[in-house]
Amino acid sequence: MSLSNKLTLDKLDVKGKRVVMRVDFNVPMKNNQITNNQRIKAAVPSIKFCLDNGAKSVVLMSHLGRPDGVPMPDKYSLEPVAAELKSLLGKDVLFLKDCVGPEVENACANPAAGTVILLENLRFHVEEEGKGKDASGNKIKAEPAKIDAFRASLSKLGDVYVNDAFGTAHRAHSSMVGVNLPQKAGGFLMKKELNYFAKALESPERPFLAILGGAKVADKIQLINNMLDKVNEMIIGGGMAFTFLKVLNNMEIGTSLYDEEGAKIVKDLMAKAEKNGVKITLPVDFVTADKFDENAKTGQATVASGIPAGWMGLDCGTESSKKYAEAVARAKQIVWNGPVGVFEWEAFARGTKSLMDEVVKATSRGCITIIGGGDTATCCAKWNTEDKVSHVSTGGGASLELLEGKVLPGVDALSNV
């Protein structure tokens, strides 16, 4: 799925116009401090383009976290983002305490030329996602008439609409598909992301290696299935590997992750790999733990020895890392989605760290390396490799759905050209 038939910001006339722009400022926070500003930085080129080309105003809207339609300004306010954005843009940013309603509409109706406005968290309104919880935590659905009113209010905040929220492009939420303006364009981040994935999937450099980690096979079935039609090699690591190893090798896996649902189709996936000539690499050894805890007792295990009862595998071992390194060394293009161990904890980070080192090495010899957002992007931030790979996606779920071969609603909703 590419933007080839969609309107993009570089083709949009913004002079004298109010631009309402959906961005993805869903950044990690600790004690109201932003811990990784990658997503904010990623939106700056689109914002600057509008200002440099004479836009009257740029009104930015985003979600943060999962307040589920309940206003939680103490926990999920976008106000800290306004300060960060001010320092990145080098100009004042007006923060509004809501995202819809008469006061917001007034503030956005006729601002001074060149004004940048940031709205409060869209998800403080249940109408953004269409469902959520009430103040007591009971599940609720938004009323259709109220969804329409919410969308109509957002539509009043600009003359043209730009969507640069690649990280949310897989969600058919009000701010993504419900703004009713004559011109709806994809921003530069959206364009960059979609172009990278389109090229990677439609005309890949070969050998093409997919590294798939993470926990559940069931969550990644469509991903594995779709990628088996595209790649030459695949590493299946992380917690997901135990389901494969138990089914294929009858390995004793102790209390390691096991996915009942996913187990049923392991053999089908392996048969497809064989039919397509895809070489699959699974881990052969493990770092084990006596409980799921940062300070657990640790041990070693292999596929042959099995993992003892009451213990679990939380990282791959050195032999697995060697096998992974060989696969990486053969590749001319790599897409990596999901870590191969519990990298957040030092004792179980070595497998993912050594794989990252190999991917960085591959990049420096000209291999195209694409990191598919989410946890794997967090690994890049943690080990400072964001500029040492070809592309770090800003969207975990969105990149996953592209790799699964799905149409993204947020892209679908843009104006055709």
Curated annotation (Swiss-Prot):
Task of the protein: Catalyzes one of the two ATP producing reactions in the glycolytic pathway via the reversible conversion of 1,3-diphosphoglycerate to 3-phosphoglycerate. Both L- and D- forms of purine and pyrimidine nucleotides can be used as substrates, but the activity is much lower on pyrimidines. In addition to its role as a glycolytic enzyme, it seems that PGK-1 acts as a polymerase alpha cofactor protein (primer recognition protein).
Reaction equations catalysed: (2R)-3-phosphoglycerate + ATP = (2R)-3-phospho-glyceroyl phosphate + ADP; L-seryl-[protein] + ATP = O-phospho-L-seryl-[protein] + ADP + H(+)
Post-translational modification Phosphotyrosine, affected residues: Y76, Y196
UniProt-annotated binding residues for (2R)-3-phosphoglycerate: V23, D24, F25, N26, Q38, R39, S62, H63, G65, R66, L122, R123, H170, R171
Known EC number: 2.7.11.1, 2.7.2.3
Binding site for CDP: G214, D219, G238, G338, V340, F343
Residues that coordinate or bind ADP: G214, G238, F343
Pathway: Carbohydrate degradation; glycolysis; pyruvate from D-glyceraldehyde 3-phosphate: step 2/5
Residues with N6-malonyllysine modification: K131
Positions of Mg(2+) binding: A215, A218, D219, D375
Coiled-coil boundaries: none
Pfam families linked: PGK
UniProt name for this protein: Phosphoglycerate kinase 1
Protein family: Belongs to the phosphoglycerate kinase family.
Binding site for ATP: A215, K220, G239, G313, E344, D375, T376
Residues bearing PTM N6-acetyllysine: K11, K48, K75, K86, K91, K97, K131, K146, K199, K267, K291, K361
Domain of life: Eukaryota
Organism: Cricetulus griseus (Chinese hamster)
Required co-factors: Mg(2+)
Lineage: Eukaryota, Metazoa, Chordata, Craniata, Vertebrata
N6-succinyllysine sites (modified residues): K6, K48, K191
Residue list for modification Phosphoserine: S2, S4, S203
Gene transcribed to yield this protein: PGK1
Compartments, record wording: Cytoplasm, Cytosol; Mitochondrion matrix
GO MF term set: ADP binding; ATP binding; metal ion binding; phosphoglycerate kinase activity; protein serine kinase activity
GO biological process: gluconeogenesis; glycolytic process
Sequence segments annotated as region (Mitochondrial targeting region exposed following cis-trans isomerization by PIN1 and recognized by the TOM complex for mitochondrial translocation of the protein): 38-43
